[in-house]
């Protein structure tokens, strides 16, 4: 028997056999598997690290947001207390000096203090001194102030948001390409390549700085600058003055109606009837809509009807004053609520976005036009006999000044600050808290006794205001219409599946069941 022929170099050390290298190929495949396993473990570890870092950052940002929310709620509650105290102080002033027109004129004229911003605030002052910069000079001044402040990296980094770490996956790595299956191909040396980090850090620029950063990357043609400024820039001082001139009379009449109502009836009744301004706003916004949230729905209509029923119960409630004076005070309160609704709806149609209008400048011009244009009303009311002009004494004058500075100038600023810290919805809901606070104040200070009709009417007014605010927030939600549709569908479905008893003569089978059963048995 001839032994098998031995290949050359088969038993020598250091010499590879010419037979298929199964051992080398298995080692190569095991190395690839170990590399894939190592890459998978590294990716999983990076994902865990990313999750931990993002979790820590979200907790820090959430804590900051909770602090802002808590501060905003405290400020709004403080505003409610100021407004109730202002109403009580106004009622006290009217017992000594019953001049609603003088009180309204003095308080509204104190808005002119906001115009001191042209002396204190540099962008306002530059709108008047830099006429060559164009009608949007204030915007360029804000941009220059931003670029001057952001000259260091520390200032820029402090304005950025918290870092967010996101894993990066490179799809074009050579290791992810399929390996060659050719056995005879020699192993090629690895090429040197740049290795990037598998984690990407993301920071967001604040919205207040994003616009200036965009302008810095744009060219200088006037048309491009003008188009971007018309889109996102604030209104100029001239435009704000024109809007203030139009709304000066509406604002004054609304506040005059409120002061007249306070001179005729209790503070609680005035505040409850004045809270219906949100419902009048709903009706006017449906007629003159400014956005999709002004859509009229059946749920909002039922809330308005509920509020009207509460207003009727409030007017039927007895009080210490004569019924005629309470009726006049209720009419003044409703008139003030309607005028305030007209003011809100029209200013929303005039200004498409709230950030375009400088609120302190707006109120400052309202006070200025009120001071310059409405002073002839003293002569008109004096000679017609509606309100005799008489200068108040020192005590009453001091009360009017304090009430105007705190209850008008300061409270408006605090309310806007609270809305910025929380939201406009929470700020609107906070206005309704003046109703129970005013009731408690009337019971404690003036010893006013209200019947059960008053509380039975106050609850629907407060509840309907809350419902309308909630429905305006969810502008596409109409639960009443959805419920009616479901009930109608349920009733129609029950009628459709219900069968009427029939006689045996009226029923006829097209296929004989006996024949069908026989065919099934034969098969």
Swiss-Prot record:
Q: Mind telling me which SUPFAM superfamilies this protein's record contains?
A: Multidrug resistance efflux transporter EmrE (SSF103481)
Q: What is the protein's major site of localization? A: membrane
Q: Which residues cross the membrane?
A: 69-89, 101-121, 243-263, 268-288, 296-316, 327-347, 361-381, 395-415, 420-440, 452-472
Membrane topology of this protein = Multi-pass membrane protein
Domain of life per record: Eukaryota
The organs and tissues expressing this protein are described as: Expressed in colorectal cancer cells.
Q: Which GO terms describe its cellular component?
A: membrane
| PTM-bearing positions, type Phosphoserine | 207
> What are the residue boundaries of the EamA domain, all occurrences included?
252-316
Q: Where in the cell is it found?
A: Membrane
Q: Which UniProt keywords apply?
A: Membrane, Phosphoprotein, Transmembrane, Transmembrane helix, Transport
**What family name appears in the similarity comment?**
Belongs to the SLC35F solute transporter family.
Check the record and name the PANTHER family matching this protein: SOLUTE CARRIER FAMILY 35 MEMBER F5, SOLUTE CARRIER FAMILY 35, MEMBER F5
- What biological function has been recorded for the protein in this entry? Putative solute transporter.
Q: What is this protein called?
A: Solute carrier family 35 member F5
Q: Give the originating organism.
A: Homo sapiens (Human)
This protein's gene is called SLC35F5
């Amino acid at each position: 028997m001839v032994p098998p022929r031995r290949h050359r170099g088969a038993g020598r050390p250091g010499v590879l056999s010419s037979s298929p290298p199964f051992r080398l190929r298995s080692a190569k495949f095991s190395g690839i598997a170990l590399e894939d396993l190592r890459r998978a473990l590294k990716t999983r570890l990076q994902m865990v690290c990313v999750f931990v870092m993002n979790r820590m950052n979200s907790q820090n940002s959430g804590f900051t947001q909770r602090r802002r929310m808590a501060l905003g709620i405290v400020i709004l509650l403080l505003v409610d207390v100021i407004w109730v105290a202002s109403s009580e102080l106004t009622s006290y002033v009217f017992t000594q000096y019953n001049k609603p027109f003088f009180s309204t004129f003095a308080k509204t004229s104190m808005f002119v203090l906001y115009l001191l911003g042209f002396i204190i605030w540099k962008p306002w002052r530059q709108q008047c001194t830099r006429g060559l910069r164009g009608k949007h000079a204030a915007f360029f001044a804000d941009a220059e102030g931003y670029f001057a402040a952001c000259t260091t990296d520390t200032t820029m980094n402090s304005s950025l948001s918290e870092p967010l770490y996101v894993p990066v996956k490179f799809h074009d790595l050579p290791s992810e390409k399929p390996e060659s299956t050719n056995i005879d191909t020699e192993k090629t040396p690895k090429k040197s390549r740049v290795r990037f980090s598998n984690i990407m850090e993301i920071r967001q620029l604040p919205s207040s700085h994003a616009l200036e950063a965009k302008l810095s990357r744009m060219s200088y043609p006037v048309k491009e600058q003008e188009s971007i400024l018309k889109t996102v820039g604030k209104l100029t001082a001239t435009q704000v003055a024109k809007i203030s001139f139009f709304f000066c009379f509406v604002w004054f009449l609304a506040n005059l109606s409120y002061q007249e109502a306070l001179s005729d009836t209790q503070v609680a009744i005035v505040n409850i009837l004045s809270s219906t301004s949100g419902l009048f706003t709903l009706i006017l916004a449906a007629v003159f809509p400014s956005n999709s949230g002004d859509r009229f729905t059946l749920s909002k209509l039922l809330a308005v009807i509920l509020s009207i029923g509460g207003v009727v119960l409030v007017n039927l409630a007895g009080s210490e004053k004569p019924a005629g004076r309470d009726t006049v005070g209720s009419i003044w309160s409703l008139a003030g609520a309607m005028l305030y609704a007209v003011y809100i709806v029209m200013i929303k149609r005039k200004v498409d976005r709230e950030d375009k209008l400088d609120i302190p400048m707006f109120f400052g011009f309202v006070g200025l036009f009120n001071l310059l244009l409405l002073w002839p009303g003293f002569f008109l009311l004096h000679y017609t006999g509606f309100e005799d002009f008489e200068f108040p004494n020192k005590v009453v004058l001091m009360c009017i000044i304090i009430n105007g500075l705190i209850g008008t100038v300061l409270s408006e600023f605090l309310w806007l600050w609270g809305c910025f810290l929380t939201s406009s919805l929470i700020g609107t809901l906070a206005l309704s808290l003046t109703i129970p606070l005013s009731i408690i104040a009337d019971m404690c200070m003036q010893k006013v006794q209200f019947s059960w009709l008053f509380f039975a009417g106050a609850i629907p007014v407060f509840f309907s205001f809350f419902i309308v605010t909630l429905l305006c927030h969810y502008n596409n939600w109409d639960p009443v219409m959805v419920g009616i549709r479901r009930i109608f569908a349920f009733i129609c479905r029950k009628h459709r599946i219900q069968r009427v008893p029939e006689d045996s003569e009226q029923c006829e089978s097209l296929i004989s069941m006996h024949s069908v059963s026989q065919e099934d048995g034969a098969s």
